[in-house]
Amino acid sequence: MRFGLFTSMGAQTWSGVLDLWRHIEATGWDIGCVADHFMPNTKEREGAVLESWSTLSALAALVPRIRVGTIVLGNTYRHPAVVAKMAAQLDIISGGRLLLGLGAGWQENEHEAYGIPFYTMRERLERLDEACQVMKSLWTQRRSDFEGRYYRLADAPLDPKPVQTPHPELMIGGGGERVTLRIVAKHADHWNVWGGARVLAQKGAVLDEHCAAVGRDPKTITRSANMALLITDKKDQVERLAETIATRLGRHAADPRDTCLAGTPDQIRDQLHQLREAGVSVLFIPSVFRPLDELRRDLDRFITEIAPAFR
């Protein structure tokens, strides 16, 4: 298994994020990802939020070993041809370390505030499907033509090409079983979702069915989980963490308790065994649910005391 940190861009400073990423690289983590939002998901819309792509580009240059990526870019925020160009350049800057996470887009207040159309869920997913086709064509073809319902390319170049071949690792985030997982089966190198072994096993079986329908080997898709870390022997702390997850993620957390990687070191090891049995090969720890000083201590314990047995 590989282990990564999923860094919220809210309530952060550039110097703090850089220090944290240098620390996780030095202590043996494998991947660092940033969230893609412009403001807090609150009615007041108050609070500083770092811009994801410029931050990630700087991190890629200054943190030279770990893979770098997004969990996940909102497809509604940028034309996919522009994202393809941005991603190719960041893959060059990083020396081929980019993990490009992409999702349909969900945070409505950002769209309202900035005048970005917030399409129906159906249309956002249809756009996500087309966006994957647009980006992969631009990355792999000398010139691209595409005539979709939402996006169009006409003899479009993309040069220089990314370092990774045939293209940067494309990760799709989301767990919708009827449509999202079908898009994953068609286009993704990597699938990411909130949840633990129960969620990943259930939705993974659905993904396998979609892969069979499109004639794809499901083993060619990396599967990753986002789980909140808490090393403790106090059950009430675990329950409070699950409540926090339910409040913060709402419908995006299919099972808040299953989304907790929490308990004693032995209990966490048991959870990791179950994750691996569910087909998960990458685990991301989000920074958003706990004070960073507390989480950082647990990150250090996890990577030195628990993770080595699963590599």
Briefly describe each language-model feature range.
Residues 1-311:
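Active-site-adjacent structural elements that line small-molecule/cofactor binding pockets in enzymes
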